[in-house]
Curated annotation (Swiss-Prot):
GO terms for molecular function: adenosylhomocysteinase activity. It comes from Bdellovibrio bacteriovorus (strain ATCC 15356 / DSM 50701 / NCIMB 9529 / HD100). One of its GO terms (cellular component) is cytosol. Belongs to the adenosylhomocysteinase family. NAD(+) binds at residues 185-187, 219, 248-253, 271, 327-329, 373. It catalyses: S-adenosyl-L-homocysteine + H2O = L-homocysteine + adenosine. Its cofactor is NAD(+). Substrate binds at T83, D158, E184, K214, D218. HAMAP family: AdoHcyase. This is Adenosylhomocysteinase. Keywords: Cytoplasm, Hydrolase, NAD, One-carbon metabolism. May play a key role in the regulation of the intracellular concentration of adenosylhomocysteine. Transmembrane segments: none annotated.
Amino acid sequence: MKKNAKMKAPTATKTAAKTPVVDYRVSKEAMENPEVFAKLAKWGREEIKIAETEMPGLMALRKEYKKQQPLKGARIAGCLHMTIQTAVLIETLVELGAEIRWSSCNIFSTQDHAAAAIAAAGIPVFAWKGLTEQEFNWCIEQTIVGWGKEGFNMILDDGGDLTNMMHEPRFAKEMKKIIGISEETTTGVHNLEVLVKQGKLKVPAININDSVTKSKFDNLYGCRESLADGIKRATDVMVAGKICVVAGYGDVGKGSAHSLRGLGARVLVTEIDPICALQAAMEGFEVTTMEDAAPLGDIFVTATGCCDIITDKHFMKMKNNAIVCNIGHFDIEIDMAWLNKNSKMREVKPQVDIHTLKNGKQVIILAKGRLVNLGCATGHPSFVMSNSFTNQVLAQMELFNNRDKYQDIAVYRLPKHLDEKVAALHLDKLGVKLTKLSSKQAKYLHMSPQGPFKPEHYRY
């Protein structure tokens, strides 16, 4: 659709998958009231303009590639948090020639004004804050159906929900048209690797998460700012002086632990990996088990990507009014199923619930055990998301235009020179002056003055 196309009322048609097809679906209030829709869309557009000034990587790609239209013919189904920053990503893909249908990858992460702004621009989007599980799946289905006879040919995913749905037998016909997948996050990459091991992955995929300019920036620096933002918006708690427990010391856990320590907390870390545990200890954190930490913590943060990190035995040991939240992708890290069955819950405000246990103690759960930084705040800052999303655009271009390089069905990473390009596109915004290698220096190091400057195995 053209960016300034007039909005149509949602209409339903029959499809092979027997799923109604509509042009867009955003918050109920916006769908029912044109004035609310217009107000939300205007607000969203103003914030998108501000975000663009903080997302130099995406804006540089628009400038560099707009005339070439490298994504002309790419029809992309996207499933990624529908935020203001994602709106800039979507419109960058459109600027480079792509057609888009979009849904969110989390039931609470959508910013309704961002979704309205994208819908008002004529781009099909299916997302609103506070989806039910049924609505969540319906929204993803809308990115699969509704393309017409041509169908779509690219997947841009975050967490693997769209990828997994596309691998269901009911969408086998649609899957045959897919060229490739780009996956944003740790959980989704793990899902792809499982599909490969099982021999079930149908198309090549690019792992965005392990690009250095994603994992070492989004996961680390992004969480370092957005975790505390979510906790403080939700609870107004004073972090200084508190005992905080961070489960997991990968990049997300590192950012979370340093964030809380920076606010004056005493931070305990739990880990399964001896290397990460040693890192945490060498950086001054006490490393212990959740069993030992449960009665000590005032604030608990899970950041593992695994299930059953905080379970019934931990809840029963916690202090009264302990705050529990998650910054991993899914709500399986905290055993919400057990908690919901074995406590009385009352909502304090949206995304903040008090659960009273059978022992009389209360536990404060944020974002219902889902992503606290997006459920209780607005997620990572625009600048760091520009790193991640620039990788996404380059990955879509790679898969779409260089298909010969990705004939084998596997999970790939972006080439090192593109990772370095992403970083380079963000330097001017920070006033960075980069030193240039002389020809003599380059010869001594056996590399091109233009890079790549590090081998693939370098860990940064």
